[in-house]
């Protein structure tokens, strides 16, 4: 008798995706982050759903409703901090996942890669709108500053900003629509994840060597299911430690002050996971130029498959490219640090240098070094 998981219309899909899926035998722990992102999304949707039951998206009561969740709702504090720090964990996994794709050349699967970029934008939009909801000082001023960037778009900019605000400033209408979109977007993200996996399973997974692994495949279950579960345990332990021991470590103390349109905080900055892009934005002393650089800093991922000039897919056997990759990582850490610093000497020049270096590494150095490595292979 044929096994039900191979014949049942629904179970058949799950079986071919998570049980009998052929996977390369050499996948390292860097391939764990896809499933970890799935867990993060699940945690965020669940905690967010329960938070939405108690939250009110009105400027008069939003801040108090978050306080009420933390003080009066059973385990409300746990839900709130799991959701806030879960977002940080989400972005850690997301950046490591993208980094893995860059290092091992996974971007040559162009459909999977492009949907991944769409997912990155969707998650960033969701996180930004979520940060506005507690209606603290940094929520309000962060929303004001970031939405105001759209006014740099020629001709339609000002009208566009007022249309997004639903008025002449960030106010009740803005908060209500941000809550609506923040609730909706994770489900769109979940749908995009399905498409991401659909395209991935068309080609099969890449592997650390970058060499086709068709002759050497193993079933996903039990090998990688067990490996993924270990990853879940490690990540959830780290998240629990963060939530239970220092829940405000990654937050901004200004967000414990209710939003006040008449009082600007001394340093307006987004959450840590946006600081690298914020540093690039600030490093250009022109509004439109800064906005274009900000968008380009992420959209640049879309042209990476075109910039791949190496004859090898992975960086595993390319020491010069590896050096450049880690220089890029160091540059991103520098930008993240600069994004949290005030706009003054020497931070301005460090930020500008790091921003130029970021684009140079991706657009110029990496393709050039790859061509050099191709010649070195002939020797």
Curated annotation (Swiss-Prot):
Recorded family membership: Belongs to the cytochrome b family.
Cofactor: heme b
Bilayer-spanning residue ranges: 33-53, 77-98, 113-133, 178-198, 226-246, 288-308, 320-340, 347-367
Membrane-related topology note: Multi-pass membrane protein
Keyword Electron transport appears in the UniProt entry: yes
GO CC terms in record: mitochondrial inner membrane; respiratory chain complex III
The entry's keywords: Electron transport, Heme, Iron, Membrane, Metal-binding, Mitochondrion, Mitochondrion inner membrane, Respiratory chain, Transmembrane, Transmembrane helix, Transport, Ubiquinone
One example of a Gene Ontology biological process annotation: mitochondrial electron transport, ubiquinol to cytochrome c
Binding site for a ubiquinone: 201
Name by which UniProt lists this protein: Cytochrome b
Function: Component of the ubiquinol-cytochrome c reductase complex (complex III or cytochrome b-c1 complex) that is part of the mitochondrial respiratory chain. The b-c1 complex mediates electron transfer from ubiquinol to cytochrome c. Contributes to the generation of a proton gradient across the mitochondrial membrane that is then used for ATP synthesis.
Note: Heme 1 (or BL or b562) is low-potential and absorbs at about 562 nm, and heme 2 (or BH or b566) is high-potential and absorbs at about 566 nm.
InterPro entries hit by this protein: Cyt_b/b6_C (IPR005798), Cyt_b/b6_C_sf (IPR036150), Cyt_b/b6_N (IPR005797), Cytb/b6-like_sf (IPR027387), Cytochrome_b (IPR030689), Cytochrome_b_C_euk/bac (IPR048260), Cytochrome_b_N_euk/bac (IPR048259), Di-haem_cyt_TM (IPR016174)
Highest classification ranks of the organism: Eukaryota, Metazoa, Chordata, Craniata, Vertebrata
Cofactor note as given: Binds 2 heme b groups non-covalently.
Entry keyword Iron-sulfur: no
Binding site for heme b b562: 83, 182
An annotated Gene Ontology molecular function: metal ion binding
